[in-house]
Amino acid sequence: MKDKQKRKKERTWAEAARLVLENYSDAPMTPKQILQVIEAEGLKEMRSGTSPLACLNAMLHSNSRGGEGLFYKLPGRISLFTLKKDAVQWSRNAATVDGDEPEDSADVESCGSNEASTVSGENDVSLDETSSNASCSTESQSRPLSNPRDSHRASSQANKQKKRTGVMLPRVVLTPLKVNGAHVEPASGFSGRHADGESGSPSSSSSGSLALGNSAIRGQAEVTRDPAPLLRGFRKPATGQMKRNRGEEVDFETPGSILVNTNLRALINSRTFHALPLHFQQQLLLLLPEVDRQVGTDGLLRLSGSALNNEFFTHAAQSWRERLADGEFTHEMQVRLRQEMEKEKKVEQWKEKFFEDYYGQKLGLTKEESLQQKEVQEEAKVKSGLCVSGESVRPQRGPNTRQRDGHFKKRSRPDLRTRSRRNIYKKQEPEQAGVAKDASAAPDVSLSKDTKTDLAGVNSTPGPDVSSATSGQEGPKCPSEPVASQIQAERDNLACASASPDRIPTLPQDTVDQETKDQKRKSFEQEASASFPEKKPRLEDRQSFRNTIESVHTEKPQPTKEEPKVPPIRIQLSRIKPPWVAKGRPTYQICPRIVPITESSCRGWTGARTLADIKARALQARGARGYHCNRETATTAIGGGGGPGGGGSGAIDEGGGRDSSSGDGSEACGHPEPRGAPSTSGESASDLQRTQLLPPCPLNGEHTPAEAAMPRARREDSASLRKEESCLLKRVPGVLTSGLEDASQPPIAPTGDQPCQALPPLSSQTPVAEMLTEQPKLLLDDRTECESSREDQGPTIPSESSSGRFPLGDLLGGGSDQAFDNMKEPVSMTPTFISELSLANYLQDRPDDDGLGLGATGLLIRESSRQEALTEAFASGSPTSWVPILSNYEVIKTSDPESRENIPCPEPQDEKEWERAVPLIAATESVPQPESCISHWTPPPAAVGSTGSDSEQVDLERLEMNGISEAPSPHSESTDTASDSEGHLSEDSSEVDASEVTVVKGSLGGDEKQDWDPSASLSKVNNDLSVLTRTGGVAASQSWVSRVCSVPHKIPDSLLLSSTECQPRSVCPLRPGSSVEVTNPLVMHLLHGNLPLEKVLPPGHRSSRLESSQLPLREQSQDRGTLQGTGENNRLAARINPGSAQTLKESILAQSYGASAGLVRAMASKAPAMSQKIAKMVTSLDSQHPETELTPSSGNLEEIDSKEHLSSFLCEEQKEGHSLSQGSDPGAAPGQCLGDHTTSKVPCFSSTNVSLSFGSEQTDGTLSDQNNAGGHEKKLFGPGNTVTTLQCPRSEEQTPLPAEVPPVFPSRKIEPSKNSVSGGVQTTRENRMPKPPPVSADSIKTEQTFLRDPIKADAENRKAAGYSSLELVGHLQGMPFVVDLPFWKLPREPGKGFSQPLEPSSIPSQLNIKQALYGKLSKLQLSPTSFNYSSSSATFPKGLAGGVVQLSHKASFGTGHTASLSLQMFADSSAVESISLQCACSLKAMIMCQGCGAFCHDDCIGPSKLCVLCLVVR
């Protein structure tokens, strides 16, 4: 016995099994049967803790392989083993039975081994064992047994197993998961196959295990294929060979499924697989890798030998089990996943509607043809994607192809977006919508997604006409956006007839210029490619900010249109939608946006305010240098930021793509120095924007008609677009301006060139002009779109803008006289556009003047000058100066984002633009920049002589603006604009800087913003006028610039606002303005209207001004008729004319800025006829339409103001009242007003302001009455009431309204708002203040404080009591502005006793709050910008509310009256959302957010090293 026991103990499994098989050699046995015999006969001692079956299984399998194996495993589904010696006999039987399953033996092996392994514990042993056994028994059952004994044994085993399984396997109900409400198609296969497989097992004895096996296969297949959805439709009625065992339904969904603990490899083998019905097998085989399936001679797929025995399959099975265990296949999770997938699909309904399996399918193209086209476009597509715009595509390809592709591409998305917007803004004429759409095409590349959504509806009609020419040509070339392209192509084809005339000519010319542009673009794109793509993704990633904005950014310029899904936000998108609104541009952008906004906000607001003041003073000291630096940084920021930001948006790439071709190419390259790659990108973006701003450049004479037509068409489109993306467009203008500044030289020519009038002047700078023209040509569409969108404040305005733009460009680009003449010719230009364009041009002109003076080298010079300016700023600026510059740099870094922001936030950009535009208007219109440039570079005799002081003063103003803008400079948007424009000024006036700096310092000393002393401004204006007269167009433009600057305290405010982009900044400038006013009797008198402008101005200027006044009067008279449409153009023309241009500029400036009152008065004094005319016009317009009312008096000014205010007010006015825009947007055609409430309203305010100003100065009663009427009308319009209140006081005080108006504007766009607010508020305050000269500054300050703290108003009501309650109330009503201003003011005018006294706690609290709320401030500011976008696009009230909210928030944060502000100002919660308080630490060092890479102030980012946005997100 002992021996027996010993033998039994020592006997191996192999020996025991051999004994069993020898004893029972009559038939093959399964491992289980062998084990039973072993156990029964005690052939081997079983040790506890081991799994005998597993061990036996493993031994049998291992010993049945190879030549030396003792055993032989019969091929088949069940592991039947026999001794090798008996193998022949059994193999024959098996062959007859199982011959058709050559793989069975392997499978059985695997099954056995799997069984062993499972049992050994890979999974739940019993479960695995059961399933393995079940599968084995199933196999045995399913396959005929060789003999009765076998069959009996098998059946008994199966029964046993069945019972066991019943016990062991939990009863799992297999509930089918439905994919999209339907079972997964057989193709996806698993569901069906599995379902059957699971459902029925061959013998139904172990259907459970079979089901498991099937499900496992399915799971595996799915895993391999990784389509979770496939698993969802597992269940299908049992069919085929397998019957379903209803007692055992397998759960394929929940983590509690038995399959979680099942070794799928044991379940899924060739045996179980072949047990499935053939069609299920085929479906499942499709899920396997190609290697693992073989095509049989019959064409059916077969498993390869190792298909189910390899790492891949093992891993897939394991991963499926893990996913099952994780609950991935539960219905809820599947629904969630489906939703996510659908979201990722991002195929809007309209896209689904127009969906094509391949590009061109609906056009009748074959797949091959489509593929060929795609291949051709692949590069372009990739590049376009990288560049965020069609831009890269275009540069890569030939100019034509590229442009078409880029254009088309851009158009596809922008157009789609535009169309979508158009959908929203169907009110606007389809044609205009089409143009706008086209205009937005470039800006809206980022918006394209949103647009595309609406596109389905809107696309079809408006988009086509605009993009038809381009799209028609490009249609096939846009494979990247097959659907959009097709749709666009179709639409374009439809619209081709209408758009073709304008567009096609443009395209050819663009093409001509494209070649040069292409190269420029290429360089730009390479840089932009690096920066844009990088930023674009960020934009997309962080579009949460913008989203407003492609975009926005735009895709979410307006919440309605642009949702945060603006990943493709292009520059325009960025401009259109703030990152926060849009998908969220890179936080870097966001922060920059915040920073830019913060920049203005920070500086303008609490900390920023104070810092801004410091900066402003430092800038004064630095003068031009600081400005140069600022401008360089700003330009870089705008260009770089705009480019990358906007580029990220896609607008830059879109428009920038074209722009970038010439202006951007060189400029981008040039500016990279300050900014590096982003700078290049940004600058490219800026240039692009600029070019966009200066669509005329492409005209270069050739394009004049087509370009003009196109711009007009675009304008029309833009009109609708503007409505849709007025914010976006505004931002675009800002971006454009930014771009203009960056691509100033080229853009200038383009601006003037559109009418071809600047072409001759451009001829002198032909290289630049050509580049500009090329750039604009490419950009023309985009730029035109942008411009038109900017101009599109009114449908009419767009056309006028188009004309005006060109003349502006001419002015800037060409000789001053020529420019003026040209401008004159395009009298129909919209003043708004001109102002906008002027601003842009002016900004451009400053660099462009460099370019002009330098000719072909203009671009390089401009770059160098910008660099020079930067250097100067660095060198000349004190630490304070550098801080602003640093801010600018930050802005540059943030500015890129801000630029992106700008791009996403046209309004802020617009504000910048406007801020720029004021000077630009002056410069552009009278070629002040050239003059500035002249004084700087090639001062003409007269220009130099009178430009010396003029330039100085202008520069001073500019510098002050720069300082102001510099203070907010960190806020990229305003910094970009203000910085750019001022930088340009500084650059241009750097040579005049010495005196200028002194002047600026003096002025700035009084007030950073207001250091644009009215008297200084006036003297500047006077000097400018004389310079204008002497220098002709250049001098005139300079004087205009001076006037703008001087008229502008508002201008500085505007600049400040734009530069601060946050109204707070603007407020500060206003206060400073008031301070200056108080300090400067001339200014005070001017503001009061006691002193005619002519008196302040030198004789030369006076005559010039009178001339200007008369011209504008004439033009305005004409305008009255064409006021809504050509009226503005006429004014623009008048402004463009040296004399009339000056007057117009004055008017525009006056209108644009609070100083307009003084300026207008001076103008009125100089040109009473004009004033009266304007007043009459205002009256007539007033009677005609509130909107019209303003136009007559300030057609140009209003237009400019309109642009500025549009930028600024768009939000504001939107908020302030849609009707306001309707009622008080005389500058904008009534249709325009309605169509572009944002635009119109802003112009209305501007108009009203101008009217008031003019009324005071010229026909105080008439204009005041008219203005009052306008104000009342505005009042009638609700939000306008506040404005009206202010306006009424304004007519009394002339500036209060502008001040109030700007507050409204800030709500729309912080930057524009700032501009407007700064200008308007400043003027308002100044004017008010000047009324009581001694109290004027304080009053203004108080008012400003109050204004900016409307919400603070409660807290500051005490102070408000000091000031006119009505005005304060009005301002409060125009809260956005007021609120914004206060923040700006406090930080901006810390030194100002009133400012701080008004908000003593406000400043510190603002600073602290800003720092604490930097994110909030920035966010709020950003939000307002983004909201402004939203409001500007469709909902005026919302924009206004947003602006107000943002302002109030800013003010509230600053004041601690957040609640009241938000409550009072923001019924519009969205506005509150968008409100982004700006950082109050503009002077603090900037550090990079660890989360998003955005640059923010150390205090803002704090120990967490995360910006507020990141913190909020986290």
Curated annotation (Swiss-Prot):
Motif Nuclear localization signal mapped to chain: 408-415
Record remark: domains: Contains two Leu-Xaa-Xaa-Leu-Leu (LXXLL) motifs, which may be required for an association with nuclear receptors. The HARE HTH-type domain recognizes and binds N(6)-methyladenine methylated DNA (6mA).
Motif range (NEF motif): 310-315
Biased composition range(s): Polar residues: 111-145, 458-473, 678-692, 971-980, 1119-1129, 1256-1269, 1313-1324
Entry GO terms, CC: nucleus; PR-DUB complex
Modified residues (Phosphoserine): S498, S500
Stored Pfam families: ASXH (PF13919), HARE-HTH (PF05066), PHD_3 (PF13922)
Keyword Ubl conjugation: yes
Known partners and oligomeric status: Core component of the polycomb repressive deubiquitinase (PR-DUB) complex, at least composed of BAP1, one of ASXL1, ASXL2 or (probably) ASXL3, and one of MBD5 or MBD6. Distinct combinations of ASXL and MBD proteins may preferentially bind specific histone modification marks. The PR-DUB core associates with a number of accessory proteins, including FOXK1, FOXK2, KDM1B, HCFC1 and OGT; KDM1B specifically associates with ASXL2 PR-DUB complexes. Interacts (via DEUBAD domain) with BAP1 (via ULD domain); the interaction is direct and forms a ubiquitin binding cleft.
Record GO biological process: animal organ morphogenesis; bone development; bone marrow development; cell morphogenesis; chromatin organization; heart morphogenesis; hematopoietic or lymphoid organ development; hemopoiesis
Composition-biased stretches (Acidic residues): 98-107
UniProt name for this protein: Polycomb group protein ASXL1
Composition bias, Gly residues: 638-654
Principal subcellular localization: nucleus
Region (Interaction with NCOA1), start-end ranges: 300-655
Region (Interaction with nucleosomal DNA): 336-346
Residue positions of motif LXXLL motif 2: 808-812
Biased composition (Basic and acidic residues): 514-525, 533-543, 713-728, 779-793
Matches recorded under InterPro entries: ASX-like_PHD, ASX/ASX-like, ASX_DEUBAD_dom, Asxl_HARE-HTH, DEUBAD_dom
Start and end residues, zinc fingers (PHD-type): 1476-1513
UniProt domain HTH HARE-type: residue ranges: 11-86
Motif (LXXLL motif 1): 284-288
Biased composition regions of type Low complexity, renumbered to the chain: 199-209
